[in-house]
Amino acid sequence: MTDLSEKVRAWGRRLLVGAAAAVTLPGLIGLAGGAATANAFSRPGLPVEYLQVPSAGMGRDIKVQFQSGGNGSPAVYLLDGLRAQDDYNGWDINTPAFEWYYQSGLSVIMPVGGQSSFYADWYQPACGKAGCSTYKWETFLTSELPSYLASNKGVKRTGNAAVGISMSGSSAMILAVNHPDQFIYAGSLSALLDPSQGMGPSLIGLAMGDAGGYKADAMWGPSSDPAWQRNDPSLHIPELVGHNTRLWLYCGNGTPSELGGANMPAEFLENFVRSSNLKFQDAYNGAGGHNAVFNFNANGTHSWEYWGAQLNAMKPDLQGTLGASPGGGG
């Protein structure tokens, strides 16, 4: 009887947490993102190019910010968050990523746009407050863009990295699962790593509705659709272990440090996604994984100050794993 009572109480606690998240999460995501700066962060003089890359899948040219690491260099694809803008990638708006990686031997690739996309190939048109468009981001990132970059910029098609924050952290992992030759390295910073489970689909739908008016059903169908499982990193740990993919996972504990991010939305969101990261670590270790960095012990909130610090910290690891030759690219 005691065991049953404990289970009932535990179920009740999960229900209350889920209900609270359903009420607060969409608005908090909007607040945590903060107001974007008017201009990008990269200083004048850096060799940053603004490419218009044709996408047959999406029926338009896609803007891509690009800094070369030299001919034949490996690349780091930096993916944006839920509220990705159409002018600059969030990594350039909020961090000096191009400065940090200048002459690192790594080409830096920042696709622009894709609000609420999860960088996925959607089942249906992505219709939001700004109208409808076609989202075939996985096809773009794994076929159209690498072909363009290999032909026009001398970037390697294989042996690259994908790094994402929040929404796109899980996207980076799934890109590595499904395209292991292209992405031998995946970085996930403050992401929800079990999106298909529990209230995940409902909460993601609410957040997408708040961030542009998009519908999760148009992306992956109802929660029972296999696409949700296909895009759930926690269900693909055996593939990541089998491919020996290099992983870099970060999630703070919701307590701000001297870096900043001391606001309730950023603190709540980091706490909210933390448990999925800890579970992922346990499952990864249990599956025999041995090629990952887990940075879960430090203070940190759901904000760019911490994601930028992680990107800067992982640079030597990226260079070593991808075989970069520092000094290239200008």
UniProtKB/Swiss-Prot annotation:
The active site is at S166, E270, H302. GO terms for cellular component: extracellular region. Its EC number is 2.3.1.122, 2.3.1.20. Residues 1-40 form the signal peptide. One of its GO terms (molecular function) is trehalose O-mycolyltransferase activity. Substrate binds at L82, R83, S166, D194, F272, V273, R274, S275, K279, H302, S303, W304. It is found in: Secreted. Disulfide bonds join C127-C132. The keyword Acyltransferase applies. Gene3D superfamilies: alpha/beta hydrolase (3.40.50.1820). Its main location: secreted. It holds the Pfam family Esterase. The keyword Signal applies. Residues 98-108 are annotated as: Fibronectin-binding. It catalyses: 2 alpha,alpha'-trehalose 6-mycolate = alpha,alpha'-trehalose 6,6'-bismycolate + alpha,alpha-trehalose; an acyl-CoA + a 1,2-diacyl-sn-glycerol = a triacyl-sn-glycerol + CoA. It is an enzyme of class 2 (transferase). Keywords: Acyltransferase, Disulfide bond, Secreted, Signal, Transferase. Belongs to the mycobacterial A85 antigen family. The antigen 85 proteins (FbpA, FbpB, FbpC) are responsible for the high affinity of mycobacteria for fibronectin, a large adhesive glycoprotein, which facilitates the attachment of M.tuberculosis to murine alveolar macrophages (AMs). They also help to maintain the integrity of the cell wall by catalyzing the transfer of mycolic acids to cell wall arabinogalactan and through the synthesis of alpha,alpha-trehalose dimycolate (TDM, cord factor). This is Diacylglycerol acyltransferase/mycolyltransferase Ag85B.
